[in-house]
């Protein structure tokens, strides 16, 4: 019997009836699909056997020029495979999307860690999808560029009311995808993106009374950087180094170190710093030129702060979960191990107990929905900086 290949091919009705990215219509649609998320999450926390679907999107929606300098960046998408542990709940389904297929042996490794559930049972509730595209383009952008893949995901979502999208990081791209899929996004609205930047973070800490390195925020130009470097030097003539950081740099690769030359702290200080900037500024990412660094700095904005000196420096990290209702819970803490010439690059982490450091959230009587209004207290830690 002869079978027509076309008759076996899956067909999809591709819908182009989506609001334009960034439009008022998209923001309205996003708000509408997000309004019941808090109730749904509370339901799942109470009823472990409630059916639900999680669309896992480990997209690194970061600056692609900087990301391309990191070897093996595409494998960062495997970091969210820990979400497969949700399959221990027998009515939970997961749709996991990657740029390139994940090796079966890696998936099997995670599934065999599930307590009380066989790997075969979990496999039946797991769908792995791939774009078959190893380029440095954001995974979310790859999906949006493939309408058939978007429709495939939508067909796998049998109950949008019990489904949500969870991502590695959230940008307007993820917001657009959530609207196109018609499911809520478990994460902060990208409209609050500034609060998560280095400039926004410094302002949050300052307003919360947390000690942080002397520095300046919301800088964009070389002239801004020079003025900030000069102001720090005037405040502390013994200062040897300062750090210039892009707002949205990551793993330390968006940083540069400025080493002050032996110049007098006088009226010519700014001019001397400007003239020596190219010689005294060193980018942390070896493959990022100064030209590219300043170009990205103009696009993202950034900060300048003093370089923290000392033989023993700790870099604690805390992971917090902010519910749609504004409740903040601490999930975990760890100590970052930094390397590189100036100790700016994340290389590993340790979960060993940090006896001298305790992180406590002191909530106000009226719980705020904004993270920067929560009180953070770090004991025995004099300064907090942002990688």
Predicted segments, located by residue:
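N-terminal accessory/precursor segments of enzymes
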Residues: 172, 184-186, 192-194, 199-206, ...
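A long amphipathic alpha-helix within ATP-dependent nucleotide-binding catalytic cores
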Residues: 291-312, 316, 330, 342-387
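Flexible loop/turn segments at secondary-structure boundaries
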Residues: 63-65, 103-106, 173-174, 250-253, ...
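Active-site nucleotide/adenylate-binding loops and adjacent lid/helix of ATP-dependent enzymes
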Residues: 189-301, 350-367
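Beta-strand scaffold of nucleotide-dependent catalytic cores
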Residues: 256, 305, 314-336
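Short acidic, glycine/serine/threonine-rich loops at helix termini
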Residues: 68, 108, 177-180, 228, ...
